[in-house]
Design a protein with these regions (language model features):
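Primarily extracytoplasmic/secreted proteins
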Residues: 1-243
Length: 243
């Protein structure tokens, strides 16, 4: 089983307040890729994703942070989606990931951590889908924070790949701005992961999460097991007794 890989990424700096956030998708998206969008708006209020997207979470106070995924059909590369929100500035990051079928085993996120500090710290995630256990997961760490901190932040240890950050700028009051940052961990086969903390330049209200994208199942997984009797092959479903 091979680790999933990042095909491409995109960021959107939403520097103008709007109730309809136009979010960039990655330039390269292949059919079957897992698309994930991470979105933070500088005001609370539920985010609305287009049809076909499945939300991991949608959490507010004082800002709103959400994430959603979709199995790509291959037409999405270089396009945008519109996310509805309470009118505000925003920041978004999008990933296209190959090597998993999200329709079989959807990606997973942690419950999420929150606080007010200069160290947004994602919580632990032990994926349960596909039976759980140690696998070649692709791990991502996310932080969303209110304010005008230096962007990008310092990322958690080992999260050195595919680092992406977006922000809403510095115009207007500090509370009208936000930041979001995401990074991929170096490959790690494990049953769970608890990233270290991000480091930002100024303390403020934040939320942080850990994500896991499952590896594709091995060839033949779930297929009938072939047995031989007297040299003649025949199929027998794996769960059947006697075998």
């Amino acid at each position: 089983v091979a680790f999933p890989t990042v095909t491409s990424t995109a960021t959107t700096n939403g520097t103008t307040a709007t109730a309809s956030a136009v979010v960039n998708l990655p330039a390269t998206v292949n059919a079957g890729d897992t698309l994930i969008v991470f979105h933070r708006s500088a005001s609370s209020g539920v985010h609305g994703y287009p049809g076909g997207w499945t939300e991991f979470f949608d959490l507010g106070t004082p800002d709103e942070t959400s994430a959603a995924w979709k199995k790509a059909d291959g037409s999405e590369g270089g396009t945008t989606i519109t996310i509805t929100q309470t009118s505000s500035k925003f920041a978004s990051v999008a990933y296209a990931i190959a090597g998993e079928d999200p329709a079989v085993t959807p990606p997973e996120s942690s419950v999420g951590a929150s606080g007010n500090s200069a160290g947004p710290d994602p919580d632990n995630l032990a994926p349960a889908g596909g039976g759980g256990g140690a696998k070649d997961y692709l791990w991502l760490a996310l932080m969303g924070i209110e304010g005008e901190q230096t962007s990008p932040p310092t990322y958690p240890a080992n999260y050195t790949e595919n680092q992406n950050a977006a922000d809403s700028g510095t115009a207007g009051a500090i509370t009208t701005n936000c930041r979001v940052a995401v990074a991929k961990r170096t490959d790690l086969n494990a049953a769970s992961e608890n990233p270290g903390a991000f480091t930002v330049s100024v303390a403020d209200d934040w939320r942080a999460f850990t994500f896991a994208v499952h590896p594709a199942p091995p060839p033949g997984a779930g297929q009938p097991t072939v047995k031989r009797w007297g040299g003649v092959p025949f199929a027998r479903p794996t769960p059947a007794g006697l075998w």
